[in-house]
Amino acid sequence: MKFKYILGLLSAAAMSVALAGAASAQDKTVKIGAIYPLSGNAASAGVHGKAAIETAIDIINNAHPELGNLPLAKNAGLAGLGGAKIEAIFADNQGSPAVGQNQALRLITEEKVVALNGAYQSGITLTTSAISEKYGIPYVAGESVAASLTERGFKWFFRVTPIASDFAKIYLDFLKDMKAGGQKIDNIALVHENTEYGTSVANVITGMFKDNGLSIALDISYSANTTDVQSQVLQLKDKKPDVVIMISYTSDAILYAKTMQALDYKPPLMMADNAGFSDPSLIKTVGKLVQGVFNRSSFSIGPPGSPTFLINEMYKKRSGDDLDDTAARMMQGFFVLCDAIDRAGSTAPDKIQAALKATDLKPDQLIMGYKGVKFDDKGQNILASGLVIQLQDGENYVPVWPKDKAKTAPVLPYKGW
């Protein structure tokens, strides 16, 4: 009987060791949920985002000392977790807030991810991050800009990108500079899709411009899934605004470009709020129809041999395109999350949360042109910043404002085609 008892203890000990070994082996891979539109109207942005995150994983999991001070590039894997590798579990939100919410739930409860990343469209980031908040799982958004996302009192949500108010201030200052140079900006039209992204950004721009003496003469709201924007373009043609600001995703931005050409409408100055106008598929499809459009950005590819140049080469092998601002912000958000996991030295949610709160990255540790990454109590990066770019050379955006970051001067009036 005593022998059987000892044998039982030994068997139990062996089982514990085996389970511990299995857990240790499992810890060699850290799973992060990445929720993006891999199908639907915004699929191009999601597919490019997937390529950006896969590039980031390559950089993290393999040693890339040539990338300078970029965190996690020097060594293979997460040093804080004994060289553990990162694995992204991609989930297609299909451009739907409800689908995105279900995917977030699945990733947390079934895939057992330690954190979430995504989800491009602000309206989907809104629903997916609500699930992570409920379950106490860290969520990092690298690209969603709706101001409301960091106004919910959430404790598990962190955003790396500048927000709508940051970009609205950039637009305001840029237009004032253009006015000082003789450009008329008295009447401004906002054209925006009607989800959380378009509506919230339009509201922020309207409020800021009004407070600074600029008039929004025309506000045009439309469905991002629309197949006909003739009436909206005819409104613009009739009202003749001095400035048109487009807040659009990819398919609707392409539709507007084609319709403007068909109806022979060109505003004197046209600006875009990133999103669809930064998508490489738009540039390939209708880039020749929107020459001279201004856009906002926080990213530019550096000279040969620089970290951003080398990263772009890696990304281009996966995607076939150069790294655009949106995909770069997605990549930056993923880097920030992985850096926090590494510093946490743990996959425990509260440890990752604490590491995110303590984040203090410097400009030379980033691929974006931010002043750094440091989160306030709401989870917003207070060091995020941006600039104005213009499509001047076929398919290439170039920085044009502010002057200290410009590679060339702005060209006016808007050329179109």
Predicted features by range, described:
Residues K2-A13, A25-W417:
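Extracytosolic ligand-binding ectodomains
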Residues V17-A25:
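Sec/Tat signal peptide C-region and signal peptidase I cleavage site
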